[in-house]
């Protein structure tokens, strides 16, 4: 996803979108794998399916890595929000005493 698009989406929305893409990719990978083992294929068809399988595996791996980074970023954002809330709560408690 381009940086400009990322700026317009929240981290949680990006995570949801990537999880959906990863799910579709895994379903496609299952379909290709079942085609490889289900039918008698010509060597050319087999090579084509194996190439597609390899491409899908690489794509899934890329999505998983990006999801890992986004989840880490989401955790950092959550911790920052909790820290800011705690500071405001302490300031409020101090101010009202």
From Swiss-Prot:
Primary localisation category: membrane
Keyword Cell inner membrane listed: no
This protein's record includes keyword Cell wall biogenesis/degradation: no
Coiled-coil ranges per UniProt: 2-78
Superkingdom in the source lineage: Eukaryota
Membrane topology: Single-pass membrane protein
Cellular localisation: Membrane
Spans through the membrane: 78-95
Keywords, alphabetical: Coiled coil, Membrane, Transmembrane, Transmembrane helix
Entry GO terms, CC: membrane
InterPro entries found in the cross-reference section: CCDC-167
Protein name: Coiled-coil domain-containing protein 167
Organism: Mus musculus
